[in-house]
Amino acid sequence: MKELNFSSLKKLEIILDGEHRGFATDLLDRAGVKGYTIINNLSGKGSHGFHEGHVMFNEDDVLIMIIAAVPPALVEPILEGFAPFYSKHSGVVFISDIQVTRLVKFAD
């Protein structure tokens, strides 16, 4: 069996209103993020109370989470891009240390 090689990256979990998906994905694309996963229709409780996930009329009316694995050097520029946004809108970015086995998926 071939030995697995692990590489350290940072995982960003970005939670925001679905109507701002374009802003967030554009920021990630411009920062050089190679890919991300978008999860729609979140439920949860935060500083604005409980948010029930449901798609009644369109996907802009729900909370979404965008998950991205990025090199540590990209974290600060991405957070700087979100800072003005989060001063006016609700949401949060969680940052975690992770290990990945296929670094080629995240590199240039």
Which residue stretches match the model-derived regions?
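Positively charged, small/polar-rich N-terminal and surface patches that mediate targeting and assembly
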Residues: 1-108
